[in-house]
């Protein structure tokens, strides 16, 4: 398979010989600056909109989320609006995303956040993990992207990159093993 970005491929090939975390991070940053996509949820620290994007991105292509996300946020701009909406309105707004159970979980989550937390998403990853539609990885993503807290998590796509470079011959690699090998010290 041919590489579209020759300079990156040469650097990646060198890196595979003796990968260091610092080299790897630099290379990923350089690649992102050159080829990263401008996505609306990357331009906010709002916990609600980050939560919506994280749940939408579960098993759904970025392009589809990119079109549905602004529509959903415009229709339900906060937890109170989502909690007050009818189930049929939420499912209708979700149409085309697949897995309607995610929309139903978001509605239930919004109701809980309004009832128990006054419409403010908790800053505790264990509480987040206990809410409908949120697993540990989503809780960590919210902690990192909304609250600026260093919580390590392995996203599916970057997981493949980590395994490719740091565990090229391994058949099965746990997230814990990846984190030990590649995670920078948390501040």
Q: Where are each of the predicted segments found?
A:
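Catalytic cores of DNA base-excision repair glycosylases
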Residues: 18-20, 26-187
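Intrinsic-disorder/low-complexity peptide segments enriched for small residues
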Residues: 10-13, 55
């Amino acid at each position: 398979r041919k590489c579209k970005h020759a300079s990156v491929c040469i650097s990646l090939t060198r890196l595979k010989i003796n990968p260091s975390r610092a080299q790897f991070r630099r290379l990923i940053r350089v690649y992102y600056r050159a080829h990263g996509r401008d996505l609306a949820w990357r331009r906010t620290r709002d916990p609600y909109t980050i939560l919506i994007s994280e749940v939408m991105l579960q098993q759904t292509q970025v392009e589809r989320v990119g079109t549905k996300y602004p529509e959903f946020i415009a229709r339900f701009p906060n937890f109170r609006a989502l909690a007050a909406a009818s189930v049929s309105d939420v499912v209708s707004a979700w149409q085309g995303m697949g897995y309607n159970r995610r929309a139903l979980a978001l509605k239930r989550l919004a109701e809980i956040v309004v009832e128990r937390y006054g419409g403010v998403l908790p800053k505790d990853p264990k509480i987040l993990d206990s809410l409908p539609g949120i697993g540990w990885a989503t809780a960590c993503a919210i902690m990192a992207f909304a609250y600026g807290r260093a919580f390590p998590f392995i996203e599916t796509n970057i997981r493949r990159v980590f395994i490719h470079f740091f565990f090229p011959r391994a058949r099965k690699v746990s997230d814990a093993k990846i984190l030990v090998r590649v995670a920078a010290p948390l501040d």
